[in-house]
Each structure stands twice: as C-alpha cells, then as structure tokens.
C-alpha cells in the first residue's frame, strides 16, 4: 500500500520527535554563509529551518558573513580590495563600508527572512549590549624563500578577546532569535571586522552551545577517497591535517571547529548549505548530513 503524503509527513515528524526532545532548551549557533546566502530559495529554506528550531524549543543564534557582498560594494564605490597573505586589508574607509554591508544590509535581510516565517528575529552586531570586544588581529606569514615570518598589518581586522553573554541570555529567555554580524568594538574605540567563522566560534564557546553549525559549500570533511567522514574527534582531526587528508581551505575551518570545542562547544558540524533544509536534516535526523567534530 502506497504511503500518502500526509502519512509520510506524520512518519517523519514522529522520527524527529526524539531529536526535538534532545535539543529542547539547548543553544545551537549557526554560521550562515557561502552559496546559500546568494540563493533566494535556499535563503527561505534556511529561515524556515531557524524558525522551526525556535518553535521546537531550541535556542537558535545566527551569525553571518558577507565577504562577496563586501567586495561588490567596495568595487561599486571604486575602492580597490587589498589583500595581504590572502587576507583582506581593512583601512578606516573600508571598515566603515564593512559595517554598513554586514550590520546594515545583510543582517537586516536575514532578519526579514526569518520574520516572514512568523518568528521574531532581531539584528545585532558585537557592539550591541557590549556583547563582543575585539583587538587588532596579529597575523604572520612565512616567506617561502627565506622561511622568515613577517607580521601582516591588516588594518582594522580584529580577533575576539571577550564575549559578554548577558544580552544573549536575555534574548534566549524571550521569543527573539538573535542574528549577529561579525563587527565589534575594541577597547581602543576602533571598529573591527572579524572573520565570521571565528566570531561564531567565540559566541558558541561563551554560551557553551550544544552545537555550532558551519554552513559551507561542501558536504563536510572528506576522506582520501572523497567520501564524507561522519564524525571526528579533535585528535582524529589533528591526525588528518598532519597526513594531508584535510588540506587547503578546509584546514582553517577545522581548526576553528577545534578552537570552538576547546572554548566549550559540545560539538561542531561542517555541512553543505547548498542542500535545502540542511539545518533540520542535521539536527532532527539520526545520522545528520555533515561532519560532526567532538572533543
């Protein structure tokens, strides 16, 4: 006997129930970025996922990036993007545009998408409620010929040094869903642009989040045969970096996951944001859809 659509939906909901109970009143931080941010249909699916998490008793927090949009705005305004060691140099004029794009444009677009589901999202950045303080990032690069390290001056690129969870705890007790842009003040009064992955990791660590999800353009961590690795311990992740299985741009992503776990996150997942409803598939199904990294 063929299953009707209603029967299938009921069966799927019944299967999801244990996971809804597992994550009830738990904090899940989702770093939203990559291809999904530029696709309207994926954006709507993401917003509905976040709304359903909230309706299921989860405390979701969204942190977002916006590198391509920043680059596009700088180009539109005739400002050349400069890079040092593969990292964007952010001068005073650039950081003002970064804040405008991240906190004033992208942030509000995500808030609007979530609000269209009937939930209440609120747009924030690190400046709000003194939530996050940063300091100038100290990055070095090694010269391939001389093997000598030199310090990069990236301008107003920052690193998180302090997270005050007071505002986020207050919002967790409300009906609000925080959507946070990775811009924060320094004790020196400057405004800093912060890598969205590390910003999300710092937020999740300060909240001892049950899960931190990184939405990317890849399925997760792959083995040498190109197959998805479903779960890794921190020690196993270090070993895969050492033997070259984890390479290229996946190295800093995994290192950020490890840092978040050391900061207090119970588990970090790298998953494909190009898959519709990937957040729900990860949280409310038995095996998930990405790579889970645990202590």
Curated annotation (Swiss-Prot):
GO BP: arginine biosynthetic process via ornithine; L-arginine biosynthetic process
InterPro entries under this entry? AceGlu_kinase-like_sf (IPR036393), AcgluKinase_fam (IPR004662), ArgB (IPR037528), Asp/Glu/Uridylate_kinase (IPR001048), Glu/AcGlu_kinase (IPR001057), NAGK-C (IPR041727)
Q: Name one GO molecular function term.
A: acetylglutamate kinase activity
Specify the pathway.
Answer: Amino-acid biosynthesis; L-arginine biosynthesis; N(2)-acetyl-L-ornithine from L-glutamate: step 2/4
Record-annotated residues binding substrate? 66-67, 88, 193
Entry's EC annotation: 2.7.2.8
Keywords linked to the UniProt accession: Amino-acid biosynthesis, Arginine biosynthesis, ATP-binding, Cytoplasm, Kinase, Nucleotide-binding, Transferase
Is Transcription regulation set as a keyword in this record? no
* Catalytic activity, as annotated: N-acetyl-L-glutamate + ATP = N-acetyl-L-glutamyl 5-phosphate + ADP
In chain numbering, the residues marked as site (Transition state stabilizer) are 31, 253
Cellular component terms per the entry's GO annotation: cytoplasm
The record's subcellular location field reads: Cytoplasm
- Name the job this protein performs: Catalyzes the ATP-dependent phosphorylation of N-acetyl-L-glutamate.
Belongs to which family?
Belongs to the acetylglutamate kinase family. ArgB subfamily.
Write down what this protein is called: Acetylglutamate kinase
